[in-house]
């Protein structure tokens, strides 16, 4: 589903789409959102198939559709606000406020929960790799990757870079600014490995025969993706959690997983726990 962007707030014009501190402190978040008729959603737009921004300004992806369902249940429209992995935390905590919540591939971690609010998980996740299909048999473990001759490419500021820095002491780690460009760079031979997620890897394998994800069924970590927001928005957090629970109960969350080719991890769980084994 492509969602037309009602208003795009560029990185150079956040002042036009910030939320006044007085209005935030004066009344509950949901009341403020419904009165203005719009929920502002921060998203990176670089993470297929969870959040991607097309050149014409439309957004699509699993997380974008979850955001759409939150807006639908609130009875408001959506305004997407660009953020990035290096600036995500700062953007959530910014004064004046830049957006109401952030969505799209954001892993639930203890560190994030210490300073911000995170919803229950709506998508299982874990670290894995992309490599060239011709070399898939070469990589059977993390030890096979952690060698000086292996070029490992990651995007800056997120958990992919953090995982690489903490677990790869010998590999040649290359930081590339645009996450969405890394798969094609691996396919072209400009890097050997991309550290990515089990949510992202299948999309690129399905769309590029030069790529493979040989460790997809053996992720290095196990976690959950959730919705991120600043502290003090407890009413909005409760509403988001209830939306996730209702989507599980009515089957719409399962259908979204099937639409995007993602593994549904909630068959025995009607109320998702954090299921988090990733600590920042």
Which residue stretches match the model-derived regions?
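Beta->alpha turn/N-cap motifs
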Residues: 42-47, 81-86, 97, 101-109, ...
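A ligand-binding cleft/hinge motif common to bilobed small-molecule-binding domains
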Residues: 86-90, 105-113, 163-166, 187-221
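Bilobed "Venus flytrap"/periplasmic-binding protein-like clamshell domains
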Residues: 40-48, 59-73, 128-181, 198-200, ...
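Short helix-initiation/N-cap motifs at beta->coil->alpha
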Residues: 26-28, 64, 80-91, 137-139, ...
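Acidic, polar ligand-binding/catalytic clefts
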Residues: 68, 72, 77-144, 212-213
